[in-house]
């Protein structure tokens, strides 16, 4: 089921700044329940996302800004562990918020200038397709 068929507003989401303490385990919140095919280990998925740092709410990446979704195979380490675990069971058409502790993100090494060592991350992910 495509987003056009569902006639939902699928513009880039705003990521609300967290009020909770830094996560010590993966937190998953389905903001919109999908009704399409489910993401399973080994499936190739296509998704749009926005990523922000937990400590400051600074956006560090968004597929929406590039106009191209991200395609990857779930569960084989092509993305951070928080994504491999957090997208399992999600259905096409859904929007999911992932609050990812640093050990399931980039850990003590960080990534780039914005994601420092031991930084927890928040992603809001729209699942577009599962194949």
Sequence positions of predicted segments:
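Cross-family detector of peptidyl-prolyl cis-trans isomerase
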Residues: 1-131
């Amino acid at each position: 089921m495509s987003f056009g068929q569902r006639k939902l507003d699928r513009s880039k989401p705003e990521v609300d700044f967290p009020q909770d303490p830094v996560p010590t385990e993966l937190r998953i919140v389905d903001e919109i329940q999908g009704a399409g095919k489910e993401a399973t280990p080994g499936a190739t998925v296509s998704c749009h996302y926005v990523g922000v740092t937990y400590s400051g709410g600074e956006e560090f990446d968004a597929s929406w800004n590039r106009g191209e979704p991200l395609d990857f195979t779930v569960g084989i380490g092509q993305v951070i562990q928080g994504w491999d675990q957090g997208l399992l069971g999600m259905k096409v058409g859904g929007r999911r918020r992932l609050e990812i502790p640093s050990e399931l993100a980039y850990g003590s090494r960080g990534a780039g200038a914005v994601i420092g060592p031991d930084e927890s991350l928040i992603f809001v992910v729209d699942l577009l397709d599962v194949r």
